[in-house]
Structure formats: structure tokens, C-alpha cells
Amino acid sequence: MDEGIVERSFMVHVNVSTRQLSEAAFVERVMGTLRETNVDAAHLTLEITEKTMLNDNPAVMRTLNALKRLGVKLALDDFGTGYASLSYLRDFPADYLKLDGTLVRDIGQHGGDDPIVRSIIQLAHSLNMSVIAEWVSTEDQKQRLKLLGCDFMQGNKVAEAVEADALGVQLRSRTSSVEERN
């Protein structure tokens, strides 16, 4: 983040597994990586699937709470398609709820998932979580999600997926073209 190629609001999202969260040294490894890359913990979001929470592993919960104390953000990924109880929303220390793309796909369609998506967004907001919708691929989906109160979106309509090396090139290019205009 030293290079000045991203805004201070830039967030890095990383998927993590139950196995990783169960490792005794996971928190120390995250801290070391943050130091090496000069990224503030507040700019890192770790994404955990509903399936991870189904394991009901006390070691995982201790790790998640330790990461939260460091300032790392947590997201409950693929929400709405698994078998997790709603009590996980209450107990899981999440900052974000990631709405699974299968629910996004049919919003705005006759008999679509608008009521379900709206309810999930309202529930997440009442628990002080922001909502990220996955698989946003049309302008109609994007506009509908805005109307339903969705906070953030991911998908082809928002930005194409890129490899890490390509992202650095794109960000540097964007920064240099902004500097040239000034």
C-alpha cells in the first residue's frame, strides 16, 4: 500500500478454509503477512463459508475472534445456499454477509428472489453487517440490488476478475493516467 496505487478504502478479500482456521499458527501467519506487505489489518477481509461454521469448532471461533481483535474483517461467504442456522448470524463475528449468486441471478424476474434477498439484506443490516452480492452480471441486477439496499457488489457488471499480478499492473496504470490528467 506504500506505492500509492490504491485508495485507503481498498480492501483485500481472501477465502480461508476450516483447516486453515484450525491451525494454531494461523493468526501469527496472517500478522506476519500483513507486516511483510505493509497492509493494515483493517484492509483485510477473510471470507468463510457457511460450511465452515457448520463444523461448530471452538478452535475456529477462537481464531476468528483473535483475528477480529487484530482489526481483520470477516465475511460469511455464499450465504443463503447452505444449511447453516440463522443463529450463526448472531454468533459469527462477521462484518459482511456475502449473498450467494444463485439468489442474485433471478432478482427482478417474475417469481424471482427479490423478497428473499430483501429480507436477508434487512436481517444483515439489523445485525450491523454490510451485504456483498455475488455474481452481479446485468445492469438490471445491479439497479435492483441498489434498490433493495445492498451495500457492495461483485461480478462481471462491476469488474472482471483478474490475477494478482495483472491487478497490480491495472492499478499502476490507473494511477499514472490520473496523474497525467492532473
Predicted segments with their positions:
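Short helix/loop segment immediately N-terminal to the Walker
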Residues: M1-E7
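A short, hydrophobic coiled-coil helix within the histidine kinase transmitter core
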Residues: R29-T33
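Conserved functional hotspot residues or short segments at active or partner-binding sites
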Residues: T63
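Short acidic capping loops at alpha-helix termini that bridge into adjacent secondary structure
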Residues: R8, D40-L44
